[in-house]
Amino acid sequence: MGSTDTEDQVRTIDVGTPPERYARGWHCLGLVRDFADGKPHQVDAFGTSLVVFAGEDGKLNVLDAYCRHMGGNLAQGSVKGNTIACPFHDWRWRGDGKCAEIPYARRVPPLARTRTWPVAEVSGQLFVWHDPQGSKPPAELAVPEVPTYGDPGWTDWVWNSIEVTGSHCREIVDNVVDMAHFFYVHYGMPTYFRNVFEGHTATQVMRSLPRADAVGVSQATNYSAESRSDATYYGPSYMIDKLWSAGRDPESTPNIYLINCHYPISPTSFRLQYGVMVERPEGVPPEQAEQIAQAVAQGVAIGFEQDVEIWKNKSRIDNPLLCEEDGPVYQLRRWYEQFYVDVEDIRPEMVNRFEYEIDTTRALTSWQAEVDENVAAGRSAFAPNLTRAREAASAESGS
């Protein structure tokens, strides 16, 4: 085949099919405080419905939502003692999945047992373990603590969530390697970008500068002040991101821990959750620190809504066409695949250590020229998707 024939070939998109299977691993359902109120809570996840409740002993439990008697929804019932009572016939289920009592019956049938989900409470967050093979969670896959949680020098979590429809949760995981989208979607300018995948973790190390043409987007005034981000996925759906800055006002850009997590609802929908805690600047009272955290969370919300706007309108693509300055998308997806196969089918290349650093030289030259041109012309990098993202973030926060 000649070069002309090759150049005339049209690249087609392979949209593939989202997996029907849900990822094995720990998934964060939200904050403990939001579930520990003595009421049942319904969570739609993993293609089914769950009920989360805390009994009189304060222990949080997660069961299948539908009663094994006649299918009543336990999330519509009530907590009685250390059981969840079905609203249909008052069958009462313990956190271990056994039916403890049927008030109108002489005895409880021996087979009266429902599915219970392994849970963990870490850094004020509630996790459930999902495994299609039914295995117990291995100790080496435990979710790590956020080191500053509970530290009086830091705020508590400011937490938000978005239901994303029409997309598989692989879309958000792809962002781990996507350096360029931080410039075009989030109005940052990455100066250093590196990935490390090993075992069940995937890490992104990024250093970036604010864009001087991002008028109305960035609050930065010192455009040489570097932002730093060390972000790691622990398993398929839970990321801890440490964010800090050099040469900035600690009140406007404090040290931050950001949680970026999600759980699948269906093969084409998921609930995206994100939380922030900030270090209280010296001399700043707790109330003001909470206001700072709220402001940071609002900025984070806009950033995630920018991503959602892209996902809502893009095609699924299993064969992305990449250039040299793109990140290791295929290697990341190979790492991600380990959570969708049986444990015995995990291949060494899915979990072996892999490192990749993007050469940012060409990108920075191009981006700086674009920024300089916009500044000289008095143009802003402000884009329509930012307006939509701000409106969505405002609606999510109820403001």
Curated annotation (Swiss-Prot):
<feature type="binding site">
    <location>
        <position position="69"/>
    </location>
    <ligand>
        <name>[2Fe-2S] cluster</name>
    </ligand>
</feature>
<keyword id="KW-0001">2Fe-2S</keyword>
<feature type="binding site">
    <location>
        <position position="307"/>
    </location>
    <ligand>
        <name>Fe cation</name>
    </ligand>
</feature>
<feature type="binding site">
    <location>
        <position position="86"/>
    </location>
    <ligand>
        <name>[2Fe-2S] cluster</name>
    </ligand>
</feature>
<keyword id="KW-0442">Lipid degradation</keyword>
<feature type="binding site">
    <location>
        <position position="67"/>
    </location>
    <ligand>
        <name>[2Fe-2S] cluster</name>
    </ligand>
</feature>
<dbReference type="GO" id="GO:0051537">
    <property type="term" value="F:2 iron, 2 sulfur cluster binding"/>
</dbReference>
<feature type="binding site">
    <location>
        <position position="89"/>
    </location>
    <ligand>
        <name>[2Fe-2S] cluster</name>
    </ligand>
</feature>
<feature type="binding site">
    <location>
        <position position="181"/>
    </location>
    <ligand>
        <name>Fe cation</name>
    </ligand>
</feature>
<keyword id="KW-0443">Lipid metabolism</keyword>
<comment type="subunit">
    <text>Homotrimer. The two-component system 3-ketosteroid-9-alpha-monooxygenase is composed of an oxygenase component KshA and a reductase component KshB.</text>
</comment>
<feature type="binding site">
    <location>
        <position position="186"/>
    </location>
    <ligand>
        <name>Fe cation</name>
    </ligand>
</feature>
<keyword id="KW-0408">Iron</keyword>
<feature type="binding site">
    <location>
        <position position="175"/>
    </location>
    <ligand>
        <name>Fe cation</name>
    </ligand>
</feature>
<keyword id="KW-0520">NAD</keyword>
<keyword id="KW-0411">Iron-sulfur</keyword>
<comment type="function">
    <text>Could catalyze the introduction of a 9alpha-hydroxyl moiety into the ring B of 3-ketosteroid substrates.</text>
</comment>
<dbReference type="InterPro" id="IPR050584">
    <property type="entry name" value="Cholesterol_7-desaturase"/>
</dbReference>
<keyword id="KW-0479">Metal-binding</keyword>
<dbReference type="InterPro" id="IPR017941">
    <property type="entry name" value="Rieske_2Fe-2S"/>
</dbReference>
<dbReference type="InterPro" id="IPR045605">
    <property type="entry name" value="KshA-like_C"/>
</dbReference>
<dbReference type="Pfam" id="PF00355">
    <property type="entry name" value="Rieske"/>
</dbReference>
<dbReference type="GO" id="GO:0005506">
    <property type="term" value="F:iron ion binding"/>
</dbReference>
<dbReference type="GO" id="GO:0016705">
    <property type="term" value="F:oxidoreductase activity, acting on paired donors, with incorporation or reduction of molecular oxygen"/>
</dbReference>
<dbReference type="GO" id="GO:0008203">
    <property type="term" value="P:cholesterol metabolic process"/>
</dbReference>
<dbReference type="Pfam" id="PF19298">
    <property type="entry name" value="KshA_C"/>
</dbReference>
<protein>
    <recommendedName>
        <fullName>Probable 3-ketosteroid-9-alpha-monooxygenase, oxygenase component</fullName>
        <ecNumber>1.14.13.-</ecNumber>
    </recommendedName>
</protein>
<keyword id="KW-0560">Oxidoreductase</keyword>
<dbReference type="GO" id="GO:0004497">
    <property type="term" value="F:monooxygenase activity"/>
</dbReference>
<dbReference type="GO" id="GO:0016042">
    <property type="term" value="P:lipid catabolic process"/>
</dbReference>
<dbReference type="InterPro" id="IPR036922">
    <property type="entry name" value="Rieske_2Fe-2S_sf"/>
</dbReference>
<keyword id="KW-0753">Steroid metabolism</keyword>
<feature type="domain" description="Rieske">
    <location>
        <begin position="26"/>
        <end position="128"/>
    </location>
</feature>
